[in-house]
């Protein structure tokens, strides 16, 4: 649609002013995220920036701030008030040939943003290994889990990244491409990281209508569930540990991970037969560990239907 000279001057001047404020602009993938409060108070931008980064404050501090805002309470932020009913705007810009395109433009109260982002962090919360020092998984880190670490350009898919940001900020369903690209990297690398586990957990909790899947999506290992996919995943992990402890050679994960995911009824009987030969070695060299593994395998098999 035609735009008057005055309108063009007004919106370009305003946009340039916002983009010059580097402290309140985030580049995520190819998307530049600009955000501001209707009241023009900078503490809202400061807080929102921390919400996006995630790992700059502890989970509990972040959860306390966003939880209070989502319940309609005013929060103190470095001596300045954050009011939940203050209008807040988030603009996602992406390059498009010689122009700039709008990937998303969101308008909501600051309390609603806090609620949406806080629930996202709760969904991706998962037990982390000791070497991982990040309390939370930032948005940038989450998107990087969908990329190939061996290529020079490690940027996430632009459309997927934009759709994921929009879903998190607005509290809507995650894009299917986030789940699909995560699973593709897992199958290609045969490696499940904390971030990838968190993506799968969050996607199933938010998008799935399967009650069993929602119940299995816990922060730590759910030892009480009888969900067949969950139990098989635990069983596969133990079978891998058995082979690694017995021989130290390439594990079942290297050879059977993809087929175990696609045809478990065919692969698991074979893996259990292989387990028996490895257990003989362990009973000779590491009898205590062998007994422990055997009890775990027996307990998990007992959870599977006949």
Short names for language-model regions:
Residues 1-306:
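Extended alpha-helical scaffolding segments
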């Amino acid at each position: 649609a035609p735009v008057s000279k005055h309108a063009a001057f007004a919106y370009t001047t305003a946009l340039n002013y916002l983009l010059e404020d580097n402290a309140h602009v985030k580049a995520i993938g190819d998307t530049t995220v600009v955000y501001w409060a209707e009241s023009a108070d900078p503490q809202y931008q400061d807080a929102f920036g921390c919400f996006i980064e995630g790992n700059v404050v502890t989970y509990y501090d972040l959860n306390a701030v966003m939880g209070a805002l989502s319940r309609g309470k005013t929060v103190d932020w470095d001596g300045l008030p954050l009011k939940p009913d203050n209008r807040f705007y988030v603009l996602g810009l992406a390059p498009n040939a010689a122009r700039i395109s709008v990937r998303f433009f969101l308008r909501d109260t600051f309390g609603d943003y806090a609620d949406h982002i806080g629930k996202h962090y709760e969904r991706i919360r998962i037990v982390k290994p000791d070497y991982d020092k990040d309390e939370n998984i930032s948005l940038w880190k989450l998107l990087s889990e969908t990329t190939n670490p061996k290529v020079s350009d490690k940027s996430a898919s632009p459309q997927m990244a934009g759709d994921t940001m929009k879903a998190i900020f607005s509290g809507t369903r995650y894009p299917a491409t986030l789940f699909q690209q995560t699973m593709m990297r897992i199958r290609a690398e045969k490696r499940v990281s904390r971030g990838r586990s968190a993506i799968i957990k969050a996607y199933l909790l938010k998008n799935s209508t399967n009650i069993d899947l929602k119940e299995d999506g816990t922060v730590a290992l759910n030892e009480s569930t009888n969900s067949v996919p969950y139990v098989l995943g635990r069983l596969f992990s133990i079978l891998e540990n058995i082979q690694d402890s017995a021989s130290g050679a390439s594990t079942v994960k290297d050879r059977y991970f993809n087929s175990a995911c696609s045809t478990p009824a065919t692969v698991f009987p074979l893996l259990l037969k292989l387990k028996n030969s490895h257990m003989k070695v362990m009973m000779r060299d590491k009898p205590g560990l062998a007994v422990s593994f055997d009890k775990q395998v027996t307990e998990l098999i007992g959870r599977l239907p006949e």
